[in-house]
Regions:
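Extended alpha-solenoid helical-repeat scaffolds
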Residues: 1-271
Length: 271
């Protein structure tokens, strides 16, 4: 029975991907299967509902309480142990739910407010330094940065991803810079206390990491930290050998100096 229901949902989903209008009258079935007692059926329904939400979030808005409730149950380890991966509860279901919530909470204070508590719980539980736990934290930060913002939640996110930035693992470091970039898009202030950890990434031998760091520092800069950041960029410029990277860095230093110069003398010295 369970396998039949799961395969039926997956088949409908495949038809939807090829010809959405053919199964538009059956969208209610995906919603119905979201409440199935078997997690594998529910998970299959989530995949379909994710695609529907990406296409048009509005019809799925009233499912926010259901998605939040399912995520809460997963985080609280209420799904069977067979769904654990490296002792993390149903990580792929968590990530799918986070992607759905990111769509539904965008520019919607009411929907987002319902999500804040469970997202905070996901951050706390996912921050266990395992690879899959890090993936969940990364996705959770992207979700928190996509929905109507909560200052408390975003501060929590910035604190968690600063550990990524300080990691010796370059993949994790890059993910941390990317996640911090999402937060900075909302308000650069959330990343200010972590700016020195970001600056340290400028000395990394990985070129893509250095480029990502320069981009983030550029967007983090304000009148109260322009001197520190531009000074570090100048140090980087002196040692850089890549022509294009030197050119890009020089351009950005000029833009920041023009925009935030604390004094005429500083501007002249910098330029």
């Amino acid at each position: 029975q369970m396998h039949v229901r799961k395969k039926a949902v997956m088949a409908l989903h495949k038809v939807h991907l090829k010809s959405p209008s053919s199964v538009s009258h059956l969208h209610g079935k995906f919603r119905q299967m979201l409440c199935d007692k078997d997690p594998s059926v529910m998970s299959a329904a989530l995949c379909a509902l994710h695609d529907l939400t990406v296409s048009d979030p509005t019809p799925q808005k009233n499912l926010v309480p259901s998605f939040v409730s399912i995520l809460k149950q997963v985080v609280e380890h209420r799904l069977p142990k067979s769904y654990d991966y490296h002792r993390v509860p149903a990580p792929f279901i968590q990530i799918r739910l986070l992607k759905i919530l990111a769509q539904l909470g965008a520019a919607d204070p009411k929907a987002a407010t319902e999500m804040y508590s469970v997202l905070s719980a996901v951050l706390k539980k996912g921050d266990n330094q395992s690879s899959i736990g890090n993936a969940i934290v990364y996705e959770c930060v992207r979700t928190a940065a996509s929905i109507y913002p909560s200052p408390v939640l975003l501060e929590h996110c910035a604190g968690v991803v600063s550990r990524f930035v300080k990691s010796s693992n370059n993949n994790l470091k890059y993910a941390g810079l990317d996640a911090l970039s999402c937060i900075v898009n909302i308000n650069p202030n959330y990343a200010t206390e972590h700016q020195m950890a970001v600056v340290d990434c400028l000395t990394d031998p990985d070129e893509s990491l250095r480029k990502k760091t320069l981009d983030l520092l550029y967007r983090m800069t304000k009148s109260n930290n322009v001197e520190v950041i531009v000074d570090k960029m100048m140090d980087f410029l002196r040692d850089a050998t890549d022509h294009h990277l030197r050119e890009e860095t020089a351009t950005r230093i000029g833009e920041l100096a023009e925009r935030y110069a604390p004094s005429t003398q500083w501007f002249i010295n910098t330029m």
